């Protein structure tokens, strides 16, 4: 994960649109004194520890819930897409950040604005990527069961 000062070179329209908003916020800060914080989420994952909030999709596409459904017998065998990525184990790598950490980051961003005028952007990730196979191995270790895939 690059730090906030790392060059920003979006590779797709989605990324370009996010960078465009950051530039608009910077322009609004310079022109009108509008203070802002843009939070750059990486891959949000998880649920509240008390289970009050979390993901619930009729058609689940996220890796971690599908791995857990598969290992716990609540769904079909996991389908792993791609095994030829230029990564150590050939599977895709993602930097996951827990939803409760994201919620805390929002509160910290509001506090930050109290003493830091202008437009700011912060990366919200854990700083380390995890491959699909690493996620599968972690689920197996936590549950004590092999993930069918």
What does each model-identified segment do?
Residues 1-38, 43, 50-62:
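Catalytic helix-loop patch of NAD(P)-dependent Rossmann-fold dehydrogenases
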Residues 3-5, 45-48, 116, 146-149:
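A short alpha-helix capping/helix-coil boundary motif
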Residues 22, 49-50, 114, 138:
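Amphipathic alpha-helical interaction segments
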Residues 40-45, 82-84:
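Short, small-residue-rich loop/turn micro-motifs
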Residues 48-51, 87:
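Alpha-helix C-capping/helix-to-loop hinge sites
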Residues 64-149:
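C-terminal substrate-binding subdomain of Rossmann-fold SDR/epimerase-dehydratase oxidoreductases
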């Amino acid at each position: 994960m690059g730090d906030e000062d790392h060059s920003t070179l979006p590779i797709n329209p989605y990324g370009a649109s996010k960078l465009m908003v950051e530039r608009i916020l910077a322009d609004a800060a310079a022109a009108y004194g509008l203070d802002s914080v843009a939070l750059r989420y990486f891959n949000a994952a998880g649920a509240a520890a008390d289970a009050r909030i979390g993901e619930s999709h009729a058609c689940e596409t996220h890796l971690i819930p599908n791995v857990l459904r598969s290992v716990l017998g609540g769904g079909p065998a996991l389908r792993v897409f791609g095994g030829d990525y230029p990564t150590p184990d050939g599977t895709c790598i993602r930097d996951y950040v827990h939803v409760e950490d994201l919620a805390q980051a929002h509160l910290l961003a509001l506090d930050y604005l109290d003493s830091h005028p202008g437009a700011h952007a912060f990366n919200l990730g854990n700083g380390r990527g995890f491959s699909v196979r690493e996620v599968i191995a972690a689920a197996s270790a936590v549950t004590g069961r092999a993930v069918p895939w």
